[in-house]
């Protein structure tokens, strides 16, 4: 198993921990594939009833691995990453995100793709992609409006302004704010409470709720977002901005 994630099962809960050496949990191609593989395996495991995705104290994830993107950005890599991200988003069992510190870019989008989000007081959510000359590429433009509404979404995406835990709770991105020392325990206890309920009722309820809040043209919207994202990251402006960021 990679050093970038830890996958384990405790009682009836699958636990996926993002764990890079620097604690920032930048999402590489390999990390995303391994998260998707672990989540899919847990979804198919009859013992597992709910899944937790968590990072560390400093960050849930600071976003895409910039150095990897500078070295290797091409359509086939992106398509693979899209497929793996959607495997995470399409898990049928309830998924809980336990967020401490930064959840930026694809890290923010991964939290949005989860069903319940618990956050510590230090959590910070944002999407700085436009400053690089590109757009959110993994579902934020389609999933965020269902959570925060048009005006708040426009401000976050168009200005890149980050949102702290309190604001995220008020706008519905976060279910509850939990003191850091209790964050994982509360996520785990919630997962185990879900595990005690009948599988069919839980999983059907999740699917019905997702259907109710989703854009009826979600798949079409995601496809448009994907194509625009591919086009934007192929631009000279994006590549130069990304190279400048990698040098910092």
Report the location of each language-model feature.
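Conserved CoA-thioester-binding segment of acyl-CoA-metabolizing enzymes
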Residues: 1-56
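C-terminal alpha-helix plus adjacent terminal tail
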Residues: 1-11, 160-166, 181, 185, ...
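Terminal peptide-recognition signature
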Residues: 16, 20, 34-35, 53, ...
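Phosphate-coordinating loops and pocket residues in cytosolic domains that bind phosphorylated ligands
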Residues: 26-29, 62, 71, 158, ...
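A general structural signal for well-ordered alpha-helical segments in protein cores
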Residues: 32, 66, 81, 141, ...
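Glycine- (often His-adjacent) and acidic-residue-rich active-site loop
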Residues: 33-37, 44-47, 55-90, 103, ...
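Crotonase-fold acyl-CoA enzyme core
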Residues: 89-200
């Amino acid at each position: 198993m990679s050093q970038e994630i830890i996958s384990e099962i405790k009682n009836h809960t699958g636990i996926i921990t993002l764990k890079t050496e620097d604690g920032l949990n930048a999402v590489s191609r390999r990390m995303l594939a391994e998260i998707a593989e672990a989540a899919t395996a847990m979804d198919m495991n009859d013992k597992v009833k709910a899944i937790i995705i968590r990072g560390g104290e400093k960050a849930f994830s600071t976003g895409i691995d910039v150095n990897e993107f500078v070295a290797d950005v091409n359509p086939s890599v992106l398509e693979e990453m899209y497929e793996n991200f959607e495997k995470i988003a399409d898990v049928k069992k309830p998924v809980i995100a336990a967020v401490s510190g930064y959840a930026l870019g694809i890290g923010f989008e991964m939290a949005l793709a989860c069903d319940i989000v618990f956050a510590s007081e230090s959590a910070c959510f944002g999407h700085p992609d436009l400053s690089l000359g590109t757009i959110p590429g993994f579902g934020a433009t389609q999933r965020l409006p269902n959570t925060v509404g048009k005006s708040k979404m426009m401000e976050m995406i168009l200005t890149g302004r980050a949102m702290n835990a309190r604001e995220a709770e008020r706008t519905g991105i976060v279910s509850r704010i939990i003191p850091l020392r209790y964050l994982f325990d509360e996520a785990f206890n919630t997962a185990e409470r879900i595990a005690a309920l009948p599988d069919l009722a839980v999983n059907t309820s999740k699917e019905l709720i997702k259907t109710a809040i989703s854009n009826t043209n979600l798949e079409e919207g995601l496809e448009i977002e994907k194509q625009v994202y591919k086009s934007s990251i192929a631009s000279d402006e994006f590549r130069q901005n990304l190279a400048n960021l990698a040098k910092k």
